[in-house]
Amino acid sequence: MMFNFAQPVYPLVLTAAKNNPENAHQQLLKTLHRLDENRHTVWGKWILENLDHSFTFEDSRLQQNLWGLTFKTPVGLAAGCDKDGLAAGIWDHFGFGFAEIGAVTLHAQPGNPKPRLFRLPQDKAALNRLGANNQGAQKVAQTLKETWQRQPRQIPIGINLCKSKITPLEQAAMDYVGSFRYLEEDADYFVVNVSSPNTPGLRSLQEGEQLNVILQELQSVNSLTKPILVKISPDLSWESIKLIIKLAKTYQLAGIIATNTTIKREGLKTNILEKTGNSIQEEAGGISGQPIRQRSTEVIRFIYEQTQGTLPIIGVGGIFTAEDAWEKITSGASLLQLYTGWIYQGPWCISNINRGLVRKLEKYKLSHISEAVGMDFNS
């Protein structure tokens, strides 16, 4: 017997997430990890079947091949959700076409002091200053190896690599390379994260020479020729983005992920952060969700225009609906990622977005999603 899984309990999950979002999230990941460990038991199979029934939707018109990988749908899970890869084998059962693990650093690190994750419901946003808390590349590699032994990857898995807090900026390249060496066999693509606002000095690596060295060193050890992308900030100037595009071409990067969270606070409805009593202007961290939707789309359009559509873009930032997704695709994104939207809209939002994308294809008389990529520039 099948039923729409989680619908009766989702309001309870939301209440828990509101009271302590980080704790609720950790409990969810631990539960999903336990489910993965028991995927071959009777109850494990039953739950996974119900997840598939409730949350997945596939249509051949949405399937794409990029970098030698098959993406059944264009909607993936953004980094920041599953930092240690605990649920890496489960995300396909929620309808995601791919999932990005991390951010992962070479050295395990606890992240910043708590509280460090806040929901801003008035803005349909989140503020996080987690600080890349994760178990470190070696442990994450072990977790992923065990996961793939139970069940081979069903969707492409990416790993978002970040610099360890204890590593000096001038040694950043070796930090990324060290993580990559541990993890290169356990994922399908890799992301150089130089845009998180929560690791001191990290965003300065986007500017020129140091990113140059990181990309050079990574590609020099990339013997399996894994696709490597770079994830950029929405707060960069157009000139800085042009420089990153140039580096992407020089080092034959697979694409650009646009964008990470913003440190800007303009236009927010939230004035005071309830949990701390402080003004939102004074609170450190990156904002994700609806407030960055427009800016991330502008960055996507700029990259697509500058590269004439020759460099694949993964669009992320403020995707809640099929309309949001369509806007990013027609602006130039081949693939999409979301996390904050998934939390606010519930786990049904992935299949809702994919169904909505198919309706858009039918409306515009297009036979495949790839025809919609950058469509705004062709009309």
UniProtKB/Swiss-Prot annotation:
Membrane disposition: Peripheral membrane protein
Binding site for FMN: A79, G80, C81, D82, K83, A103, N160, N193, K231, T259, G289, G318, Y339, T340
Active site: S196 (nucleophile)
Keyword Lyase among record annotations: no
Stored Pfam families: DHO_dh
Main location: membrane
One GO-annotated biological process of the protein: 'de novo' UMP biosynthetic process
Domain of life: Bacteria
A GO CC term assigned to this protein in UniProt: plasma membrane
Reactions accelerated catalytically: (S)-dihydroorotate + a quinone = orotate + a quinol
EC number(s) stated in the UniProt entry for this protein: 1.3.5.2
InterPro entries: Aldolase_TIM, DHO_dehydrogenase, Dihydroorotate_DH_2, Dihydroorotate_DH_cat, Dihydroorotate_DH_CS
Cofactors: FMN
Positions bound to substrate: K83, N128, R129, L130, G131, N193, N198, N260, T261
Note on cofactor: Binds 1 FMN per subunit.
Disulfide linkage: none
Primary role: Catalyzes the conversion of dihydroorotate to orotate with quinone as electron acceptor.
Annotated protein name in UniProt: Dihydroorotate dehydrogenase (quinone)
